[in-house]
């Protein structure tokens, strides 16, 4: 499954990837590509009340001011996000994960600092308690 950032056309990226694979075959290897479907990327609108409340919850959990918590609209290559937004256009989607700069997320040596897990769990609990 090919995931692309929200600013990229999914089908165009798929075509370019297939062309690249077919044009860069080591030792004349045979390459066959059969696209099975694509998931559309998603870009969040971080101005909604859910993002504001999550920013406040993260700030409280990490012991910083809310303006020190950066909101980002990226990470929306998860196809489910675009499908949910298409089905429920007014719904606010807030994505966050348990990771820190040196955790090696999705890598073979992925390792998350336990204090990060505690902080994220605290932020989630605060968000759920305060979001209406």
Predicted regions and their residues:
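Short edge-strand/loop segments of extracellular domains
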Residues: 19
């Amino acid at each position: 499954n090919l995931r692309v950032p929200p600013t990229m056309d999914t089908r165009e990226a798929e075509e370019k990837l297939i062309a690249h694979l077919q044009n860069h075959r080591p030792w004349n290897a045979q390459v066959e590509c059969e696209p099975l479907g694509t998931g559309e990327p998603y870009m969040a609108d971080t101005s909604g009340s859910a993002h504001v409340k999550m920013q406040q919850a993260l700030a409280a959990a990490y012991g910083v001011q809310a303006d020190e918590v950066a909101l980002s609209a990226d990470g929306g290559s998860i196809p489910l996000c675009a499908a949910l937004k298409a089905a429920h256009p007014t719904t606010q989607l807030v994505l966050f994960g348990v990771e820190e700069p040196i955790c090696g997320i999705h890598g073979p040596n992925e390792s998350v600092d336990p204090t990060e897990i505690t902080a994220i769990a605290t932020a989630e609990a605060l968000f759920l308690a305060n979001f209406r």
